[in-house]
């Protein structure tokens, strides 16, 4: 199956090259040889002739024509990162809620009940989760900080 696909592509390439190399008034189809190997060899010879006619372009010529500028897209980080307004509001509300809950004193009877224990566990879990999220975000920023340093313009 692959061999037939290669033969079909070779035939198509030979036909298109033959049409491109002829003047417009002579565009008519020629009979193709039935021997597949002869046709493939002929296609290779045509492509080699076409390559020898074209001027060679060295890698240095290509690089010298392009202007490559490498600059850092990183901006100096301030102590207080700028966050969208919605995130700031959300943080403020969360801190206010946590602050009000932490300032209320729990009586020993509250701590002995199931609700008091659940509340304390909830606060511990929330603090641990916030610390974990902060550390994870910090780690991800350190991983991807160098990805935006090189910019091609």
Curated annotation (Swiss-Prot):
Q: Which keywords fit this entry according to its UniProt record?
A: Glycoprotein, Membrane, Phosphoprotein, Signal
Membrane topology per record: Peripheral membrane protein
Protein name per its UniProtKB record:
Glycosylation-dependent cell adhesion molecule 1
Question: What gene does this protein come from?
Answer: GLYCAM1
Modification type Phosphoserine: residues: 47, 52, 56, 58, 64
Can you supply one Gene Ontology CC term for this chain's record?
A: membrane
Tissue spec. comment:
Highly and specifically expressed in the lactating mammary gland.
Signal peptide range equals 1-18
Q: Name one GO molecular function term.
A: identical protein binding
The UniProt similarity line reads: Belongs to the PP3/GlyCAM-1 family.
- The residues that carry sugar chains are 34, 78, 95, 104
Q: Where is this region: Disordered?
A: 95-115
């Amino acid at each position: 199956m692959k061999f037939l696909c290669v033969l079909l592509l070779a035939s198509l390439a030979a036909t298109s090259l033959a049409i491109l190399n002829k003047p417009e008034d002579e565009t008519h189809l020629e009979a193709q040889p039935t021997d597949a190997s002869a046709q493939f060899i002929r296609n290779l010879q045509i492509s080699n002739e076409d390559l020898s006619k074209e001027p060679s372009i060295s890698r240095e010529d290509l690089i010298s024509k392009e202007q490559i500028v490498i600059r850092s897209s990183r901006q100096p980080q301030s102590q207080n990162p700028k966050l969208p307004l919605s995130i700031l509001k959300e943080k403020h509300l969360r801190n206010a809620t946590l602050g009000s809950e932490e300032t209320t004193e729990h009586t020993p009877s509250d701590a002995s009940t199931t609700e008091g224990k659940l509340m304390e566990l909830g606060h511990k879990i929330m603090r641990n989760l916030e610390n974990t999220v902060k550390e994870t975000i910090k780690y991800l920023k350190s991983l991807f900080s160098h990805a935006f340093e090189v910019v091609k313009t």
